[in-house]
C-alpha cells in the first residue's frame, strides 16, 4: 500500500480520515416475472435514523428481462447468503412492494456480499513532501460508501482533473518535477464535496451506533436534508436540482434558489423518532 511505501522512503505518515457506518451490502440477479407491465426503472426505499436501518433497491433491465436487487443494512448485519434469504430480508422493509415483486421472480445468480464499505480519505495533498513519479487516485486516495454511487464518478472527475492539471503544469514548468505533490493538492478540491455528501448521513449513523448524541450541526443537517428529500419527491424542479447535485453534475449551491428553499420550508417536519434520510442517491 502507498502509505507503507512512503514511510519506507522516510516520508511523513499520511493523515487518514475514516467514517465507518458499518453497513452490509448484498446483491443478486433475478429473472423478471411475467406480466410485469408497470412503467418503472428503479424501486427503492431509503433508510431513516434511528428506526429504519435497512434499504432495498430493485433495478429493472427490461430488454434483458432481468432485475438487479440490492439490500443494504446499517449496523454490522449478517449479510444474506442465498437468494431466499435476500428476498426474506426485503419483507422487513416498511414498503411491501419490493418483497412481493421478488417473491415472483426467479433467482439467476448467487448472492454477492461486500463489507468493506467505510468512507476513507487519505490526505496525500497535505503531506509536506511527496515523491515525483507517483500519483494516488481513485479508491487509493478516497473510498466512499458504495450506497451513494459516487465512486466511479469521483474516479472520472479525478482523471479529468489529472488531464487538465498535467497540461497546464507542463506548459508552465516544462517539466514534471514536483507535479505529484501539485496534483495531490489539486485533487483535494475534487474530493471535498462527495466526501461531505457521504458524511451527511453516515456520520449520524456512526453517532447512533456509538450511543453519542448527534451534535447541533448534525441535527440541523439531518433536518434540512430530510426536508430537501421530501421536497424533491413533490416538485420536479427541486428533484432535477437534487439529482444533479447527488450525481456530482452540479455543486450543492445549485440548491440555494428561492424556489427550492421555499419548497423545503413548506415541508412538514418528520415525526419524532422517524427522521428522514440524509442526502444521497438511492
Show where each model-derived region lies.
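Alpha-helix boundary/capping residues
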Residues: 9, 93, 105, 246-249, ...
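FAD/FMN-dependent oxidoreductases across multiple families
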Residues: 64, 77-190
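A structural signal for well-ordered alpha-helical segments within the folded catalytic domains
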Residues: 3-4, 83-84, 157-160, 222, ...
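Predominantly flavin-linked oxidoreductase catalytic cores and closely associated redox partners
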Residues: 1-94
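C-terminal helical "tail/cap" subdomain of flavin- and related membrane-associated enzymes
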Residues: 164-282
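Short secondary-structure transition/capping segments
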Residues: 66-74, 142-153, 215-232, 282
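Generic structural hydrophobic/aromatic packing signal, biased to beta-strands
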Residues: 28-30, 58-60, 69, 90, ...
Amino acid at each position: 500500500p502507498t502509505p507503507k511505501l512512503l514511510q519506507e522512503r522516510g516520508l511523513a505518515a499520511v493523515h487518514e480520515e475514516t467514517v465507518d457506518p458499518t453497513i452490509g451490502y448484498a446483491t443478486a440477479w433475478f429473472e423478471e416475472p411475467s406480466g410485469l407491465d408497470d412503467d418503472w426503472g428503479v424501486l427503492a426505499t431509503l433508510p431513516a435514523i434511528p428506526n429504519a436501518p435497512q434499504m432495498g433497491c430493485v433495478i429493472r433491465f427490461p430488454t434483458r428481462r432481468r432485475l438487479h436487487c440490492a439490500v443494504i443494512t446499517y449496523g454490522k448485519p449478517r449479510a444474506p447468503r442465498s437468494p431466499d434469504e435476500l428476498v426474506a430480508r426485503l419483507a422487513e422493509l416498511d414498503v411491501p412492494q419490493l418483497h412481493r415483486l421478488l417473491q415472483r421472480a426467479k433467482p439467476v445468480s448467487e448472492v454477492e456480499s461486500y463489507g468493506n464499505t467505510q468512507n476513507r480519505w487519505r490526505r496525500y495533498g497535505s503531506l509536506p513532501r511527496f515523491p515525483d513519479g507517483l500519483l494516488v487516485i481513485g479508491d487509493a486516495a478516497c473510498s466512499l460508501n458504495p450506497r451513494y454511487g459516487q465512486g466511479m464518478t469521483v474516479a472520472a472527475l479525478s482523471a479529468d482533473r489529472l488531464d487538465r492539471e498535467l497540461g497546464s503544469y507542463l506548459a508552465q514548468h516544462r517539466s514534471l518535477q514536483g507535479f505529484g505533490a501539485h496534483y495531490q493538492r489539486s485533487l483535494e478540491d475534487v474530493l471535498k464535496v462527495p466526501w461531505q455528501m457521504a458524511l451527511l448521513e453516515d456520520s449520524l449513523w456512526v453517532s447512533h451506533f456509538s450511543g453519542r448524541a448527534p451534535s447541533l450541526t448534525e441535527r440541523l443537517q439531518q433536518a434540512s436534508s430530510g426536508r430537501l428529500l421530501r421536497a424533491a419527491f413533490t416538485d420536479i424542479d427541486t428533484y432535477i436540482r437534487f439529482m444533479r447535485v447527488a450525481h456530482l453534475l452540479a455543486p450543492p449551491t445549485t440548491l440555494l434558489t428561492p424556489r427550492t428553499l421555499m419548497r423545503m420550508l413548506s415541508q412538514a417536519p418528520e415525526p419524532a423518532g422517524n427522521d428522514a434520510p440524509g442526502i444521497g442517491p438511492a
